[in-house]
Amino acid sequence: MTYPNLLDRFLTYVKVNTRSDEHSTTTPSTQSQVDFATNVLIPEMKRVGLQNVYYLPNGFAIGTLPANDPSLTRKIGFISHMDTADFNAEGVNPQVIENYDGGVIELGNSGFKLDPADFKSLEKYPGQTLITTDGTSLLGADDKSGIAEIMTAIEYLTAHPEIKHCEIRVGFGPDEEIGVGANKFDAEDFDVDFAYTVDGGPLGELQYETFSAAGAELHFQGRNVHPGTAKGQMVNALQLAIDFHNQLPENDRPELTEGYQGFYHLMDVTGSVEEARASYIIRDFEKDAFEARKASMQSIADKMNEELGSNRVTLNLTDQYYNMKEVIEKDMTPITVAKAVMEDLGITPIIEPIRGGTDGSKISFMGIPTPNIFAGGENMHGRFEYVSLQTMERAVDTIIGIVAYKG
């Protein structure tokens, strides 16, 4: 189905810079997210028909569409995030490519281009309307496409009371891209039987398995002396960082793994001879494998300290989120419903693990099973990001189908 306000709504949203800041200590991490929620989303939530609309100190804008059929007793939530990834989000100037011809798309005057030779996903979209960047910023389809889709679904349901639906709760939240947005999510206040994050990629994605995730911060303490007299005295902290890294499995890196394979990912190294720091993320799907990866890093640190004769390597591990499969497999209703709705709409469900995490990873462990459904974005987090309007329309269809489902 087509929705006349969907494109303009999306274009309005992406032009607002809501980039999150991993170094911030506030919630939300940036004032722009607060302003977007209170000045743009809250008024529009009320306009499209949501009731009891409010903004919480945790950064979530919340609203409710009451059920219009007493036989539909479920309460279902839909959640999308306001923030965008760590890439330029100022001056977003989207291009709308109608009836895409399957060829190369020049991204404004930036010199960058979307070429099917480089981005095979483009082969799915001839004849469709694509929204791209102008090459100078990301687009923000992750996850403003989800916000626009949820808002449009509510608008349509309000205008069409003949479509009977259950109670719907909507939540637009902050800071998903920096991994902390759901930390303060109020599951008791949201009060639904299950929910969906509308934060996936291409048409048909339906996901209930995520990585389990941890962060590792390493400190290496060296001893700096003049290199001319260093023998037997110098301890080079940078060399310690290299030695540590070289003891990790060389093939367990993001660029060499896929599917259900986990990895260690070196994110950052800084330092000097005297002192160095390294930051890693650890990812795996199975709990035992996840725990083994953390234990392996600790074992390497302990072994190095033993060989050095002093505690020069310090490792701090922090769990970030867990595979929501552990929760959702106990009651597959949200998957069964979404799968049935997609199939009724002629959409082939693509059920595969997320090689990442969503807000649903944390919210599921708060007591609300929250799988992820497609929102349409491709090549997310950079200048090559784009989305199909037709996929966004199908996401709206899916949301409407889920809340009207009687099975």
Curated annotation (Swiss-Prot):
It comes from the Bacteria. Its EC number is 3.4.11.4. GO terms for molecular function: metallopeptidase activity; tripeptide aminopeptidase activity; zinc ion binding. Signal peptide: none annotated. It is found in: Cytoplasm. It catalyses: Release of the N-terminal residue from a tripeptide. Its cofactor is Zn(2+). Binds 2 Zn(2+) ions per subunit. Cleaves the N-terminal amino acid of tripeptides. Belongs to the peptidase M20B family. This is Peptidase T.
